[in-house]
């Protein structure tokens, strides 16, 4: 049996710091280097729109990170949007850990299978309390909460109405405002 080499977080950081990966869109997921798909116009426009909307709603209550790494056990994915604890200067010397994350958002078109399977399992296993997938293919928001093991026990498929993140129950986020396509 042949086993794939698994990268540790420290080895991954050395590789990133060396510059070898500078021309590649990759991330570390469960010790494996995963090549990411290029973003199309729908993906990037949705990302920009949702980030601006979140910043309007949250102000300084949280930091909104766009496609920047987070550090989990044996993984350093770059979710499209990470809503993390303030202040921003906490992340000058490290990426946010699971304990810093309010919720994550992936915008999925070509990566829907990866986002709803492998990334979901990684996020759940690391205790990410809330994980949203903006499904560009099926025009819906899929909200995952209550992580247990490799999955989430609560899943909502939304196309209209409001959603309140667990970390901000007073916040009413319009689903249709995120699904502008």
What are these regions (language model features)?
Residues 1-181:
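Gly/Pro/Ser/Thr-rich low-complexity, intrinsically disordered segments predominantly at protein N-termini
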């Amino acid at each position: 049996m042949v086993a794939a080499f698994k990268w540790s977080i420290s080895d991954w950081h050395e590789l990133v710091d060396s510059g070898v990966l500078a021309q590649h869109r990759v991330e570390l997921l469960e010790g494996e280097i995963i090549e990411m798909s290029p973003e199309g116009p729908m993906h990037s426009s949705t990302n920009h729109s949702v980030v601006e909307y979140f910043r309007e709603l949250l102000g300084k209550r949280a930091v909104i990170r766009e496609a920047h790494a987070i550090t989990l056990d044996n993984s350093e994915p770059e979710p499209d949007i990470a809503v993390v604890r303030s202040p921003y200067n906490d992340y000058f010397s490290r990426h946010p850990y699971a304990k810093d994350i309010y919720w994550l958002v992936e915008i999925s078109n070509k990566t829907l299978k990866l986002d709803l399977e492998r990334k979901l399992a990684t996020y759940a296993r690391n205790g990410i309390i809330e994980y949203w997938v903006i499904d560009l293919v099926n025009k819906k928001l899929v909200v995952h909460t209550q992580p247990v093991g490799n999955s989430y026990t609560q899943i909502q498929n939304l196309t209209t109405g409001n959603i309140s993140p667990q970390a901000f129950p007073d916040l009413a986020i319009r689903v249709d405002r995120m699904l502008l396509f």
